[in-house]
Regions:
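Alpha-helix N-cap/helix-start motif at helix boundaries, enriched for small hydrophobics
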Residues: 62-64, 209
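Short loop-to-helix capping motifs
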Residues: 59, 133-135
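Junction motif at the cytosolic side of a transmembrane helix
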Residues: 196-215
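Secretory targeting signals
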Residues: 1-40, 64-133, 142, 150-151, ...
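Transmembrane alpha-helix boundary/hinge residues in polytopic small-molecule transporters
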Residues: 48-49, 123, 139-140
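Transmembrane helix segments
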Residues: 135-169
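Transmembrane helix boundary and interhelical loop/hinge segments in multi-pass membrane proteins
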Residues: 37-56, 60, 68
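Alpha-helical transmembrane segments and their helix-entry boundary regions
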Residues: 52-53, 63, 137-139
């Protein structure tokens, strides 16, 4: 029993160490993204913009979807900027041309995967803003999800004996898992994750937003 317990402890420690190692690779992009979403979109509630447009006759679903589209556009910009900066730094500091070692299909698939993951993250962040409607609280909740969401879900997987069947759909950690040379295989998963986030988080919280008082 002691041997089994030590093995479980070491495996858990390895998962935690690997998580924090990869976390700091995607953190510089994802954290500014959720801060932007939390602050920018909560301004509409604070300044009365939401109430103004709804009273003008704009449907709540149209308003909510328009904000999601803005969030997706910003997410794509964040990812592309980070991607190009990374290529440029590799070229300048390490003399690496960047993408000569792989095929065009892998490069395109990688770009689509990463874009979909970032868009899924912004969907979650914006949905929470519309649920909470407070910039500070939204930032805190989104930051906690970035820091500890994967660990909580992986702990749940371990308790239920599900392997990685839950965390494979955690878009935030998948941002760093996807490799360019295997991006084609990851693309279906990225598509499923994006639409799942849009339906689950966007659909449920959008429905709540539709029924809530906005005064």
């Amino acid at each position: 029993k002691a041997t089994i317990g030590m093995r479980e402890y070491l495996v858990g420690t390895e998962v935690s160490a690997n998580y924090w190692d990869s976390f700091f690779n995607y953190y510089p992009v994802v954290f500014p993204l959720i801060i932007f979403c939390s602050y920018y979109f909560s301004n509409d509630f604070r300044q009365g913009t939401v109430k103004h447009y709804i009273e003008k006759g704009l449907s709540r679903w149209s308003y909510f979807l328009s904000k999601l589209v803005i969030g997706w556009s910003v997410s794509f910009f964040f990812f592309v900027s980070a991607f190009l900066i990374g290529l440029l730094c590799n070229k300048i500091f390490f003399g690496i041309s960047g993408l000569t070692f792989t095929s065009i299909s892998n490069i395109v698939s990688y770009i689509f995967c990463e874009a979909l993951y970032h868009m899924a993250v912004s969907t979650l962040a914006i949905s929470l803003v519309f649920l909470i409607r407070n910039s500070s609280v939204s930032m805190a909740v989104n930051a906690l999800l970035i820091f500890f969401g994967y660990l909580v879900l992986h702990g749940l997987e371990s308790i239920l004996g599900l392997g990685y069947n839950i965390t494979i759909f955690w878009a935030i950690s998948n941002i760093n898992k996807t490799r360019i040379d295997m991006a084609v295989q990851w693309l279906p998963t990225a598509i499923i994750i994006f639409f799942a986030y849009m339906i689950i988080f966007g659909g449920v919280i959008g429905t709540i937003f539709k029924k809530r008082d906005i005064t």
